[in-house]
Amino acid sequence: MARYFRRRKFCRFTAEDVIEIDYKDIATLKNYITESGKIVPSRITGTRAKYQRQLARAIKRARYLSLLPYTDLHQ
């Protein structure tokens, strides 16, 4: 029986020694949002809980200030 081993996920913010995630850094925030505008969960991205909370807060602030869309599926 062959086992399938997945590559271990790592937190990008820990690796880069980020102190706090900024809501004005739109390029970084867009990597953690799906095409429909949802925040990607940490079990998929590998982000640690501390940074996932900061990420969610930053995304919500950016949405409130119209820096990010709430959804991309406007018809």
UniProtKB/Swiss-Prot annotation:
GO biological process, one term: translation
SUPFAM superfamilies noted in UniProt: Ribosomal protein S18 (SSF46911)
Entry keyword annotation includes RNA-binding: yes
Keyword field contains Cell membrane: no
TM stretches of this protein: none
GO cellular component terms, semicolon-separated: cytosolic small ribosomal subunit
Signal sequence region: none
GO molecular function: small ribosomal subunit rRNA binding; structural constituent of ribosome
Pfam annotation, one family: Ribosomal_S18
Role of this protein: Binds as a heterodimer with protein bS6 to the central domain of the 16S rRNA, where it helps stabilize the platform of the 30S subunit.
Family designation: Belongs to the bacterial ribosomal protein bS18 family.
Protein name: Small ribosomal subunit protein bS18
Species: Baumannia cicadellinicola subsp. Homalodisca coagulata
Lineage: Bacteria, Pseudomonadati, Pseudomonadota, Gammaproteobacteria, Candidatus Palibaumannia
